[in-house]
Amino acid sequence: MIFKKIRKGHADWRNFLCSTPARDYVFQKDAYEDQIDRAAKNIRNTDCVIIGAGAGASTAAGIQYGGKRFTDNFAEFIKKYGEYYMTDMYAAGFYPYPSEEAKWGYWSKHALMNRFDPPALPLYTELYDIVKNKEYFVLTTNVDHQFYKAGFDEKRIFATQGDYGKIQCRKACHPKTYDAKDLFRKMDKARRDCLIPSELVPKCPVCGGNMAMNLRCDNYFVEDEAWHEAADRYAGFLEQNKDKKVVLLELGVGFNTPIIIRFPFEKMVRENSSYSLIRLNMDEAVVPESFGERAIGIGGDMAKAITDIKGLVL
């Protein structure tokens, strides 16, 4: 995971990363009802909540990258490029498309399906209801804009990995991103045989080269001014609340990019006796045993867990 040199005057985001896993992970054996009760009590009694959300949160909310949602909506792409390669939207994003017309033929549809077309989903709106009267901040690796749609204050969200709604210079020749909603709509209407017309292929307004999605996948990811400002606000929030009672509410964060949310959250709990961790995860709800009562690991259906916690918090 590559984070670039920090611009002068901005917080060094790398200070908040952590690559050290716990050595004492356990699956808690507490009854589900007891875990929900404890989680709700911790949230009710805390000064502030820091939400850390990974891909599992949006999967639980209903944004499925595979299965019927993929095969129904991307049938022409599966037929054209082969089911061996087109197994789901994640794999399709890494396919070596033979042309810019083909690349944007895919990505315009992907962005519309996962960023622009879905409304605010219940898991996210219920999560907002839980924290809206608290001091809160959201740290997320998701790029689907669900937190914004659900009503969270955009000044309290740091989306570290980009945005499906933005594009950038493929070689990052300048530190700026561009809103692509209208362009993607045009591409979607004009697409034929998985390809968009050549006249719709975006070109960098500075160097004239190809454009790319604003997603962190290599060293060319553009961290624009808004990205750095969000990082600064997150750093400020941590500093302002370091001596308060804080709940770290982690949702759907696995071991794909754990250095951004999972390991840093554990580090904060180790270093701050007034911090506690609530970890919701379908299959990886392990928590450090040494955290004792300051950690709750809730496995299974995250959407149900959020609903149940909300029922006890409000």
What is each model feature region?
Residues 1-314:
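Conserved catalytic alpha/beta core of Sir2/sirtuin-type deacylases, generalized to analogous enzyme cores
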